[in-house]
């Protein structure tokens, strides 16, 4: 069924939607409420309807980033397709959907509240990035302190990775990278 992911930036709303679509083996459409209009919504719904004529598969997933930015008519355009199961809607928002999403659409969606990432989550993300990123895993990186890194990331995975990229990029050549509070705050 359709749902809305509500939480601060960088907590994984978009990533979760991709994981859901991939694990369910569903066709996946993405729209950004910032740059899409009613015409774009109708095109995706029409594609989903025509694809369903030729397959007996499950309904595709339509992910709408920043769904709170859609106006009433844009949200109205989704109603029929969500209600009849033509699409499964996954909306992502940083704003309270009770105030930003129209009641008829909200009543057809489960709302999941996501919280800012905790220090342990950020540490896991940092460890994984250092081990699996194609550039980082080939650099000599010594993580001495993480307080400033985690404080500046403020529970946001995207910020953490951006700060990490800036810090590592400040060390030119084959110089070993030292991540400590001073380096993070001076970059």
Per-segment meaning from a language model:
Residues 28-61, 72:
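Short glycine-rich substrate-engagement loop in P-loop NTPases that contacts/grips substrate
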Residues 31, 63, 88-92, 113:
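Structural recognition of the conserved hydrophobic beta-strand(s) that form the central parallel beta-sheet
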Residues 170-187:
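Conserved C-terminal helix/linker of AAA+ ATPases
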Residues 79-80, 96-110, 127:
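Short regulatory helix/loop adjacent to the ATP-binding pocket of P-loop NTPases
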Residues 32-34, 110-123:
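Conserved AAA+ ATPase "SRH/arginine-finger" region at the nucleotide-binding site
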Residues 1-31, 46-49, 79-80, 84:
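Walker A/P-loop
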Residues 147-152, 158-173:
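C-terminal helical "lid" of AAA+/P-loop NTPase domains
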């Amino acid at each position: 069924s359709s749902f809305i992911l509500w939480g601060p930036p960088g907590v994984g709303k978009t990533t979760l939607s991709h994981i859901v679509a991939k694990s369910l083996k569903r066709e996946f459409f993405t729209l950004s409420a910032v740059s899409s209009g009613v015409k774009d919504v109708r095109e995706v719904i029409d594609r989903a309807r025509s694809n369903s004529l030729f397959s007996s598969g499950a309904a595709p997933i339509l992910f709408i980033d920043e769904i709170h930015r859609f106006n009433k008519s844009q949200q109205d355009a989704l109603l029929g397709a969500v209600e009849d199961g033509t699409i499964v809607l996954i909306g992502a928002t940083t704003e309270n959907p009770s105030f930003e999403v129209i009641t008829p659409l909200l009543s057809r969606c489960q709302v999941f509240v996501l919280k800012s990432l905790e220090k342990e989550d950020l540490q896991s993300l940092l460890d994984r990035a250092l081990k699996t990123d194609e550039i980082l895993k080939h650099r000599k990186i010594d993580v001495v302190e993480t307080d400033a890194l985690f404080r500046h990331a403020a529970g946001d995975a995207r910020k953490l990775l951006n700060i990490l990229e800036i810090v590592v990029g400040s060390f030119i050549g084959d110089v070993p990278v030292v991540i400590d509070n001073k380096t993070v705050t001076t970059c």
